[in-house]
Design a protein with these regions (language model features):
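Active-site anion-handling motifs in enzyme catalytic cores
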Residues: 1-379
Length: 379
């Protein structure tokens, strides 16, 4: 237990799932007796992704800023609430950025865990080379429940030898079966495991420690929709009518155009109490949850809510078919919870989720994943 572990993940994202999965993995390892720090690394693109306003150097940036002027104060407050959460609940190393030497970042650790979240999704703006630990020697390297999502691996896609970097990891596990297969084929190794997201390793009782008290003092439906998608909003409108309950959603798209769009569907936009601990409260106390998000799904399962996931149409017209969601629903035998919007009225015909069965299955998956991780650290 003298092993000092560094966790490298998307802990600085203004994204509820990202910060809570970082918190969850950290707390699991602390509970097991390890010394743990989240490596406080900021990728090159982070600042530009999350600042309320961009430098007015292009027409696009000017239009972007105009769309945010009416909500700039809300965005700033949300950013501050995320920072407060990190400062309070995340055990951070000192700060590093893309200009830091890798030797300075990693020399203090015996083991580095990359993940979870989409840290190996090379199509994302915040997927930095560092998440593949290039030129990092003499420490154990573990990838835990990394997600590649739709990314196609190619050794030439980055400035590093991607295949060689991944091959040098001592242990690799992926969050989705398809991702594990993709990584196995890429590096020609068959021992890539499938493990569940860190958030799902804990019970609701462990999140109750940080969960805010009830905020909405009425019965309600909670919509967690990352992109203000029309399919999810239409589903919310239909389900609100079926259940005769109001729908609340968090301010995630972070611009006034989306806020107006959401309001047109009769959904109430939450613009205060937006911290990750508040997010937990909105799910915990909801009568029903609608989501298009993997972590919206995960916390619905953790708090044993009745819920549906919306299989949205993309700009191409094709269904999203999010493998992160389909994988966990399949593991728990509740695939019927993933609905197309043209089938949304069938929600009233769904049987209630039997959480005696589902939570037992989730606990077994959690034990298997924890056993894999502890073995990877100790061997």
């Amino acid at each position: 237990m003298n092993c000092k572990i560094g966790i490298l993940t998307f802990h600085k994202s203004i994204n509820y799932g990202s910060v809570l999965q970082a918190y969850a993995l950290q707390n699991l390892l602390l509970k097991e007796g390890y010394k743990v720090e989240i490596i406080d690394y900021e990728p090159k693109n982070y600042a530009n992704m999350y600042i309320p306003f961009k430098k007015p150097t292009t027409i696009w940036n000017i239009l972007h800023n105009l769309n945010r002027v009416p909500v700039g104060k809300i965005i700033k407050e949300q950013n501050e609430e995320f920072k407060k959460f990190r400062d309070t609940y995340i055990n951070l190393s000192r700060e590093y950025n893309f200009e830091s030497y890798y030797s300075d970042i990693f020399s203090q650790f015996d083991c580095v865990i990359c993940g979870s979240d989409q840290v190996w999704n090379i199509t994302l703006d915040d997927c930095d080379d560092i998440f593949f630990l290039p030129c990092v020697k003499h420490i154990k390297k573990i990838a835990y429940a990394v997600s590649v999502n739709d990314a196609k691996f190619n050794s030439c896609i980055r400035d590093i030898d991607l295949k060689n970097c991944i091959s040098e990891f001592n242990y690799i596990s992926c969050r989705e079966k398809s991702g594990a297969t993709k990584i196995s084929n890429f590096i020609a190794k068959e021992d890539v495991a499938v493990t569940i997201d860190p958030t799902l390793l804990h019970s609701a009782r462990e999140y109750d420690v940080i969960c805010s008290k009830r905020i909405i003092n009425q019965n309600y439906i909670f919509l967690y929709d990352m992109w203000s998608n029309s399919d999810a909003l239409y589903a919310a409108k239909v389900i609100s009518s079926l259940f005769n309950l109001p729908v609340y959603t968090l301010f995630t798209k972070r611009n006034v155009k989306s806020m107006i769009k959401i309001s047109k569907y009769g959904v109430k936009v939450i613009t205060k109490n937006m911290s990750p601990t508040d997010f937990l409260s909105y799910i915990k106390y909801a009568d029903f949850v609608i989501t298009d998000s993997f972590h919206g799904t995960a916390f619905s399962l953790i708090f044993e809510k009745q819920f549906v996931c919306i299989n949205e149409k993309q700009n191409s017209g094709k269904l999203k078919n999010d493998e992160r969601i389909t994988n966990i629903l399949s593991e728990l035998n509740i695939e019927e919870r993933y609905l197309r919007v043209d089938n949304i009225h069938s929600v009233k015909d769904l049987d209630n989720i039997n959480y005696d069965i589902v939570t037992e299955k989730r606990n077994k998956l959690a034990k298997k994943s924890i056993d894999w991780l502890l073995k990877a650290i100790e061997e």
